[in-house]
Amino acid sequence: MADNKGTENDWFLVEATDCEETLEETSLGDLDNVSCVSDLSDLLDEAPQSQGNSLELFHKQESLESEQELNALKRKLLYSPQARSADETDIASISPRLETISITKQDKKRYRRQLFSQDDSGLELSLLQDETENIDESTQVDQQQKEHTGEVGAAGVNILKASNIRAALLSRFKDTAGVSFTDLTRSYKSNKTCCGDWVLAVWGVRENLIDSVKELLQTHCVYIQLEHAVTEKNRFLFLLVRFKAQKSRETVIKLITTILPVDASYILSEPPKSRSVAAALFWYKRSMSSTVFTWGTTLEWIAQQTLINHQLDSESPFELCKMVQWAYDNGHTEECKIAYYYAVLADEDENARAFLSSNSQAKYVKDCAQMVRHYLRAEMAQMSMSEWIFRKLDNVEGSGNWKEIVRFLRFQEVEFISFMIAFKDLLCGKPKKNCLLIFGPPNTGKSMFCTSLLKLLGGKVISYCNSKSQFWLQPLADAKIGLLDDATKPCWDYMDIYMRNALDGNTICIDLKHRAPQQIKCPPLLITSNIDVKSDTCWMYLHSRISAFKFAHEFPFKDNGDPGFSLTDENWKSFFERFWQQLELSDQEDEGNDGKPQQSLRLTARAANEPI
């Protein structure tokens, strides 16, 4: 039999023969002697084991994961250092210069930053999906790895810088609401500026929190218009609210982030355009939608521009006479106060609302102030001094203590009887008794005493520092009493030369600005000075024209800084009421003022529903 080619079976035969011999030598009795019980005592290790530093291992794993996420978010370079191949890493470790040497042509094209991809507008993916859904983390990690390795595709860049987040939110808002956020709101540059009404758009709000937001906002607001806008690619909370107190943007965002678990960068907050008809119609139409939650009374600026009855009221033209009547009744003669306080009335007065809508506000304010001054000047001219004082006292509310005035005069060692006689002659305007001088050392209360009296009587102040102007005496034409505070030697020289008739109480000619010189009877004049005019012979012609009293002692103050003598309007009112007869002021019943007088001037016709 021929051997098989390529095979040799000698070794196998020998091995089989050895195995047979071994089995024959082994007897069955020996197999019975083999113990079938195994020793398992060392199988379980019951020795105490050390746990090891598992916290350190967990910390390393967390750090590595955070570093990987951070590298995935880098946008400035498309290729992260961790994306290099092993060969590139070896070359860079050998020499940095070798890395720049390459046979193939390098592509020097710079990739531009892709702000918006086709499928994503730039916001985080978490804002596009419901937070209650389960998200496969491995898929997100794979996608981020593709981005930081240079693969710029449909995924795009999901995180924008802070300056671009607002642009992305505005774009999302316009796509969903159908109108631009800036068309509904006016921009506040400062976060500290306060407003009562706010328009809010909040992204990232869970749907199960909407009902709780409605309840929580009612404790802070008087009006709420809320809608949870949901589309395929967008979801946000849209609100128009009026708070119980005015709040700044900083306070509003802090309140929203306290109520809702959202980030402040995903909140748009601006005050609404309260004078835009289009914006008012937008809010009015939304309030009637079934998907919008509305709580509270409709805001007045929405009702005024949408409801028919309010539209008819707002169409009434502006009437200057109503504005003049308001300024006259409230005693406003300064243009700045008239403009400000009348603008405040726009919410409740239709004529003030028409004033704000006018393009000639400055002209109306100027004309109003001028007309009020004309009326008040004519009214003051026809009043006697007694009637004028009675009217000023009637404007003071409350009662005081006349003894405070008397104590102060006695403290300054002023004879009370002599002072009352001079004060009576001053108010009556007797010739040669038309000027009352209070002189003495500094800090004795001269100016305080005279200015408190001038404030009660509604007088005017003239200053010698304006004597270079020929109009410096013009305030005396509109006053029942005047004050020249702190007269010095040049002032007394001027009065000795030019103002002797004024000190006599005679008729003088005063040059008025933008008007012809006017002849008036000089009103009673109070003067304070540190100079005793009657003791100086150089002003001997003024001695008979001035009644002088000296304040010798320094004005006292209490430990807490309050004045030792209270020279208030209430105390002066009590003083005049107590010494009305001694000052020879006429009885108001004799002048026809039996009780409070009726309104002396009415510029507008009485309304049909106004009581007589």
UniProtKB/Swiss-Prot annotation:
Q: Which HAMAP family does UniProt cross-reference here?
A: PPV_E1
Region: DNA-binding region; residue ranges are 148-315
Pfam families the UniProt entry points to: PPV_E1_C, PPV_E1_DBD, PPV_E1_N
Q: Which SUPFAM superfamilies match?
A: Origin of replication-binding domain, RBD-like, P-loop containing nucleoside triphosphate hydrolases
Classification via InterPro entries: Helicase_SF3_DNA-vir (IPR014015), P-loop_NTPase (IPR027417), PPV_DNA_helicase_E1_C (IPR001177), PPV_DNA_helicase_E1_N (IPR014000), PPV_E1_DBD (IPR046832), PPV_E1_DBD_sf (IPR046935), Rep_E1_papillomaV (IPR016393), Znf_lg_T-Ag_D1_dom_sf (IPR037102)
What's a single GO CC term here?
host cell nucleus
**Localization in the cell:** Host nucleus
Kindly provide the PTM information from the record: Phosphorylated. Sumoylated.
Glycyl lysine isopeptide (Lys-Gly) (interchain with G-Cter in SUMO) cross-link position in this chain? K521
| Family designation | Belongs to the papillomaviridae E1 protein family.
Show the coiled coil region(s). Answer: none
Signal peptide, first to last residue: none
What reactions does this protein catalyze?
Couples ATP hydrolysis with the unwinding of duplex DNA by translocating in the 3'-5' direction; ATP + H2O = ADP + phosphate + H(+)
Which protein are we looking at? Replication protein E1
Broad class of the protein's primary localization: host cell
Q: Which residues carry this modification: Phosphoserine?
A: S80, S95
Residue positions annotated to bind ATP are G440, P441, P442, N443, T444, G445, K446, S447
According to the lineage, what is the superkingdom? Viruses
> One GO BP annotation here?
DNA replication
Spell out the subunit comment.
Answer: Can form hexamers. Interacts with E2 protein; this interaction increases E1 DNA binding specificity. Interacts with host DNA polymerase subunit POLA2. Interacts with host single stranded DNA-binding protein RPA1. Interacts with host TOP1; this interaction stimulates the enzymatic activity of TOP1.
Alphabetized GO MF terms: ATP binding; ATP hydrolysis activity; DNA binding; DNA helicase activity
Q: Where is this region: Disordered?
A: 587-612
Instruction: Enumerate the PROSITE patterns for this protein.
Output: SF3_HELICASE_1
